[in-house]
Design a protein with these regions (language model features):
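Flexible mid-to-C-terminal extensions adjoining Fe-S/redox cofactors in radical SAM and related proteins
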Residues: 3, 25, 250-331
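Core AdoMet radical
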Residues: 6, 26-38, 52-68, 81-100, ...
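Residues at alpha-helix caps and immediate loop-helix transition turns in enzyme cores, especially N-
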Residues: 34, 70-73, 101-102, 168-172
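N-terminal pre-triad scaffold of radical SAM enzymes
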Residues: 1-25, 50-62, 245-250
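SEC14/CRAL-TRIO lipid-binding/transfer domains and related phosphoinositide-recognition modules
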Residues: 11-12, 36, 40, 44, ...
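Radical SAM enzyme [4Fe-4S]-AdoMet core and its adjacent flexible, acidic
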Residues: 31-33, 122, 130-142, 146-275, ...
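Short, acidic/polar
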Residues: 42, 98-108, 167-169
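Acidic (Asp/Glu)-rich catalytic clusters
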Residues: 46-51, 75-82, 104-114, 146-150, ...
Length: 331
């Protein structure tokens, strides 16, 4: 297993929604540290990497909302380090803005170098607002989309597909396919608050009932039944990204370690976790239910299998796959 990149994560950005499937289980409180302290640490780490491990990529990341207290400073740093956030921002959970305010803000975003924004729609207006936990969120996102396009900013729109919004997909796809956006449909995960959606997952029959137009935006290769994953398993992973999550509970300990020791500690955690918990392909052989017709992404199904394996074997282990905390991502 080869470490390919280092990800510095500081979840200090407030989100103004309370979505039903929030990966980060946002509850109104940020868990990161103040920006200046995080950026100073990230800058020092990046400088050390360039001098000592130039083969490793580097990313600075602050979560799924762009309401960063020092957004433009963060964008500049992300551009300096070739982090994705230097050109791409996720716009879910933003604070309310009028259309004029959105125009001014998005114009600033564009001038700062942002080329692409991402928006998530859960359904038509009433359903979307209930799912997002905020009245008016649908109209805010739609206004954001229209203003961004008028300014020449590229927009991608994702729609998580569950049983509850199946009857809304034709209208949604018809709406967004007429706009100049990159549209994609996907099955939501069962991680974080997403575990509450497990009974709402769509089946193969649900997929077959979709119109051809809707199917055009849904990637069946990445959303399969358990038997389909078993019958055509993915290649085994060989690379990993190490994530350093900066929290009030760990920042002093992290700052007191050398950068090399931080990397070594995370690699040891990674090795221990994956020598204890089998790979996705191994768990497929052990657990795949050939009669289950639900559709899963690999990320979702592997999370379900890992949880089952850990519980069945009564294993006490730190979950290094929890994307809120320090850990690793294998790919």
């Amino acid at each position: 297993m080869k470490t390919k990149s280092i990800n510095i994560l500081n979840l200090n950005v407030p989100c103004h929604c309370h979505c039903r499937y929030c990966l980060l289980e946002w509850n109104g409180k940020t868990i990161g540290i103040d920006y200046d302290r995080s950026i100073n640490y990230a800058k020092s780490f990046y400088k050390w990497l360039k001098e000592n491990k130039p083969e490793l990529n580097f990313t600075y990341y602050f979560g799924y909302s762009m309401e960063h207290p020092k957004l433009f400073e963060a964008i500049k740093f992300m551009q300096e380090t070739n982090s994705p956030g230097g050109e791409f921002l996720q716009f879910d959970g933003m604070k309310e803005r009028t259309k004029d305010e959105l125009f001014d803000f998005l114009a600033e975003i564009k001038n700062a170098g942002i080329k692409l924004i991402d928006l998530t729609f859960y359904g038509l207006e009433d359903y979307h607002d209930k799912f997002a936990g905020r009245l008016g969120d649908y109209n805010l996102l739609m206004n954001t989309l229209d203003v961004a396009l008028s300014l020449g900013i590229n927009v991608e729109v994702g729609i998580p597909v569950i049983k509850e919004n199946l009857d809304q997909l034709n209208e949604l796809v018809d709406l967004f396919s007429k706009k100049n956006v990159n549209l994609f449909l996907f099955t939501p995960h069962s991680i974080g608050r997403g575990k509450t959606l497990i009974n709402s997952k769509i089946t193969l029959d649900d997929y077959e009932s979709m119109s051809k137009n809707v199917k055009n935006y849904f990637n069946r290769n990445t959303n399969r039944t358990q038997y389909e994953w078993l019958n055509n398993p993915p290649k085994e992973v060989s690379n990993r990204t190490l994530t350093i999550s900066l929290l009030s509970t760990n920042i002093e300990d992290i700052e007191n370690k050398t950068f090399e020791d931080v990397i070594k500690e995370l690699e040891e955690m990674d090795y221990y976790f994956y020598s204890t918990v089998p790979s996705f392909n191994e768990l497929l052989i052990k657990y795949a239910d050939k009669n289950d017709k639900l559709l899963y992404s690999k990320k979702d199904l592997y999370a379900i299998y890992r949880k089952r394996y850990i519980q069945e074997n009564k294993i006490n282990i730190i979950d290094i796959t929890d994307e809120r905390y320090s850990g690793s991502i294998r790919y």
